[in-house]
Structure formats: C-alpha cells, structure tokens
C-alpha cells in the first residue's frame, strides 16, 4: 500500500466458482501455490513465508479425495501447508450445508452473510462490513459473580450497547458523498455513483453488514462452571451462550433490517492483552482467567489444553457455525515438512467437519 503495509487481502482458490473458467482457475491456483512454496526473499536475502495475500484453498468433491479430478492440486496445496502453513482450508461441503453457497471471506476470517439483490441473486463481491464492536465475554461473567442467570442479564445489556455502537457507525455515514473515495464509490470498486450521491445508497443496495464480535468463551465457561468447554457440562453452556448471541442479533435485525447484523468470532490479535489487562485491573488475579496475560480467541479451546487435532476441530466446528460474520479454527502441530500425507488426512477431516480452518 502507499504507506508501506502489506495489503490485507485473500486469494480465493475455488476451482468451480465459475465453471466456465475452471481450467484457467486451476492454472492460476497451481502458480499461486508454487510461488508460496518457493517463498520470498526478505531484506536480508533469506527466503521467508509471506503473510499476505492469504491463500484460501476450497475443498470440494472434485479435489478432496484420492481419485478426484484435481486431487493432484490438493497434494500441491498440502505440500505448501507442510512447508509454509498456508493455504487455509474452506470446506465447500460444510459451507453449502449451512449457508447454501460457498464464498470467500474478506481478509483473514470476516465472512459476509448471504445477501440477495432485487433479482434474488446472491452478492458476495463489491460488499463490505461497516465495522466490528467486540464484547469481552469474561468481563460479563466476572461481573455476575458466577451467577449464570445474572451473566445473561449482563450480557444482554452489553449486546444492547454494542447494537447502539453499530447503529452509530451506520448513521455517521449518512450524508457522506461518493466523492470522498472516488475509486470505491464512483469508479466501480464498490459502486458507480455520481459524486454527489450518498454512499448509504450503495451500502444498503449491496447488503453491507455491521458486526458484533465476542472473545473469551473459554474463560467465561471456565469461570461459570469450573470446567473447559471440552467437557459435556462446559460445552452445553458454551453452545447456549453462542446460541444466545446469534439469536440476539437475529432479533436486532427484525427491528433494524437495514443494519444486517452478523456475529463475529473476534481473533483478538491486537486486543487480547488489552482485554486481559482490563479484567485483571477490575477483578484482580483469578487463576486460569486473568492470570495468563491474554484471553482466548473467540470460541476456541484453550491453547494449553492437551487435545487431539481431529477432536479439536470436531468440538469447535459446532461453535463456529454460529458466527455468521466469520471465524476460523486453528490446529497446532509439530513440523510437518516431510509428512504431506498427514496434512492430506487433516484436509479430509476439515472438509467433512468445519467451514474454515487452518494449520
């Protein structure tokens, strides 16, 4: 970019997204994967793995299992994953089961919920999100003193505050003209408006979303039940919390349909420490909650917990599905440079289990 940052973009590697260009898509995907495997020299002349663009490899019927038409391309993707921990994996099967369509996220993990135009055609490109307001779930849990009923009362209040933040963001755009960013609003990146047109016209017509995020589900469940959400009791509460969040946003959309609320599994890359500091300052040191220096990403299982990679995906997949605004699950492994076969087995499990994941 003009200020020297890596563009925060993703490349969608969905072979059958446009069937008439399938062969061309395969050639492009092959080249992207070969380039990622080769790596890029940094300023010191050392070959390194570039962070962006993110590569998103879509697993489908034609490339997941041995014998499928493009399995050779998946083997190349697995080689890239083994060496570069990229591409990420999107399951066409699971996404279609849940959303009816398969489509890419924006950047790393922010998905746009399905939106159809006046002709009932889904739109996935030329859309965007107006911003995210994230809720610190453990804060509500600690404020409740361990009373689950009180926790949900407090969570409801915080959701209402987040709704107001989203509404404010939308209203701040009222009266903003297309001339503020011609390449976006006048020249076709998003729309082709006249310079004096309000951008809200395009935002409404193209189904932009506003997002409420959440983080620290693990700490919340652990504080309220004393158990991880890998246990039956812990998971039942975790699932109930996720359903409550999703249903609350669905109710918001009934009364404010123009805002198109979506639930986002906040990654906590920049705010994890800040949220943790606020918890510790307010509630003191609480074992396994405020004593770590971080709170756990979205719905994820605690990174310190010993768990099989396949089981981790099994559990987290059930929680990921609530996050219509996007979320990603990770698994951590030992170096797999010489074990592409194991990567391929993980790919198969991801295809059958979870929408979006990475190694």
Task: Locate the predicted segments by residue.
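Conserved catalytic cores of very large enzyme subunits
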Residues: 1-206, 223, 227, 231-359
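Contiguous, well-ordered alpha-helical segments that form the cores/surfaces of helical PPI scaffolds
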Residues: 210-223, 243
């Amino acid at each position: 970019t003009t200020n020297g940052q890596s563009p925060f973009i993703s490349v969608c590697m969905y072979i059958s997204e446009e069937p008439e260009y399938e062969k061309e898509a395969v050639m492009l995907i092959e080249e992207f994967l070969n380039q990622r495997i080769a790596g890029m020299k940094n300023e010191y002349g050392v070959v390194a793995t570039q962070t962006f663009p993110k590569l998103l490899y879509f697993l489908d019927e034609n490339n997941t299992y041995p014998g499928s038409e493009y399995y050779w391309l998946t083997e190349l993707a697995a080689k890239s994953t083994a060496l570069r921990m990229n591409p990420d994996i999107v399951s066409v099967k699971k996404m279609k089961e849940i959303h009816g369509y398969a489509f890419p996220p924006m950047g790393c993990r922010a998905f746009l919920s399905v939106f159809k135009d006046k002709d009932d055609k889904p739109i996935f490109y030329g859309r965007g999100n107006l911003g995210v307001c994230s809720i610190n779930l453990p804060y509500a849990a600690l404020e409740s003193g361990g009373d689950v009923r009180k926790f949900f009362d407090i969570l409801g209040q915080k959701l209402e505050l987040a709704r107001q933040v989203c509404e404010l963001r939308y209203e701040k755009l009222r009266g903003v003209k297309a001339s503020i960013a011609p390449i976006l609003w006048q020249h076709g990146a998003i729309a082709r408006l006249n310079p004096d047109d309000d951008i809200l016209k395009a935002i409404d017509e193209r189904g932009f979303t506003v997002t409420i995020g959440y983080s620290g589900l693990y700490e919340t469940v652990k504080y309220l039940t004393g158990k991880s959400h890998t246990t039956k009791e812990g998971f039942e509460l975790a699932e109930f919390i996720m359903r409550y969040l999703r249903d609350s946003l669905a109710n918001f959309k009934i009364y404010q349909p123009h805002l198109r609320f979506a639930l986002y599994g906040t990654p906590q890359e920049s705010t994890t420490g800040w949220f943790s500091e606020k918890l510790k300052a307010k509630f003191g040191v609480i074992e396994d909650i405020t004593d770590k220096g971080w709170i756990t990403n979205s719905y994820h299982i605690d990174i310190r917990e010993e768990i099989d990679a396949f089981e981790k995906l099994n559990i987290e997949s059930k929680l990921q599905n609530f996050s219509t605004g996007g979320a990603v699950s990770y698994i951590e492994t030992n170096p797999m440079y010489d074990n592409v076969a194991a990567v391929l087995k993980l790919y198969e499990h991801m295809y059958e289990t979870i929408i979006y994941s990475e190694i």
